[in-house]
């Protein structure tokens, strides 16, 4: 069975989504006692780990998927916009520390996927450099800014560590009567056999760009950016 760990768990949204799709939550991290009491009632078998800053990824049960909806206050346009340097939104780095500790302990086997959710302000905070920092922290590689200077609402980058894809989703199209847009990012790590299987090779991406140029065709900006990155970075 596919297993899941939930960081910044709140009232257990990730866990609820997991059980509805045949995934078993093993553990969660939430520092606020009230929401933790709610998840304790609805998911009594889930191990509650508490404060994320005190968790060692090498010492907790390995899981296939780690989810993290890290605090958005420092990224949101409604806040002071301290970005990832802020005390709350900067907790994202603890999530990635836990991921790396677990992968090192399991020789790269777990987690297989990392899922991150946050506000659209992550695209623009700190002169648009915070989302670049998120991608680089997950991919452990230098990720260039888009040619337009703006992050697309959907995109993909790859590194030797993993393949990363993101997309903006709006709650109103998912059964909730409100307009609420959020970034959802999924990283698939090397070693599980999926990233290379379902992605174009470096040579293929370079060929698409070359033929488009030869024929005078203009590719959509997002597609051209993704192809250019893959043609440059490869595996």
Label every model-predicted segment:
Residues 148-151, 198-235:
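C-terminal target-recognition/interaction regions appended to catalytic cores
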Residues 2-55:
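SAM cofactor-binding core of SAM-dependent methyltransferases
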Residues 19, 139, 213:
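Anion (oxyanion) recognition and catalysis
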Residues 55-63, 75-198, 203:
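Class I S-adenosyl-L-methionine
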Residues 1-3, 110, 203, 235:
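Intrinsically disordered, low-complexity and often Lys/Arg-enriched segments
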Residues 16-20, 41, 97-100, 136, ...:
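Short, well-ordered alpha-helices that flank and scaffold nucleotide-derived cofactor binding pockets
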């Amino acid at each position: 069975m596919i297993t899941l760990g939930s960081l910044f768990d709140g009232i257990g949204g990730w866990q609820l989504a997991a059980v509805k799709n045949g995934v078993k939550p093993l553990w969660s991290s939430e520092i606020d006692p009230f929401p933790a009491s709610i998840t304790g009632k609805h998911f009594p078998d889930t191990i509650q780990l508490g404060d994320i800053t005190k968790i060692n990824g090498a010492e907790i049960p390995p899981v296939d998927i780690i989810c993290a909806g890290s605090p958005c206050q420092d990224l949101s346009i409604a806040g002071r916009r301290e970005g990832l340097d802020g005390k709350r939104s900067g907790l994202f780095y603890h999530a990635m520390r836990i991921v790396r500790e677990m992968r090192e302990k399991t020789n790269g086997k777990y987690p297989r996927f990392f899922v991150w959710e946050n506000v659209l302000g992550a695209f623009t905070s700190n002169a648009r450099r915070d989302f670049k920092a998120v991608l680089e922290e997950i991919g452990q590689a230098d990720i260039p800014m888009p040619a337009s200077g703006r992050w697309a609402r959907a995109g993909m980058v790859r590194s030797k560590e993993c393949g990363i894809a993101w997309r903006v989703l709006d709650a109103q199209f998912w059964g909730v009567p409100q307009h609420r847009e959020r970034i959802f990012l999924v990283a698939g790590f090397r070693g599980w056999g999926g990233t290379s299987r379902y992605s174009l090779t470096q040579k293929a991406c370079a060929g698409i760009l070359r033929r488009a140029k030869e024929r005078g065709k203009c590719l959509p900006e997002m597609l051209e950016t993704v192809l250019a990155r893959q043609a440059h970075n490869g595996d």
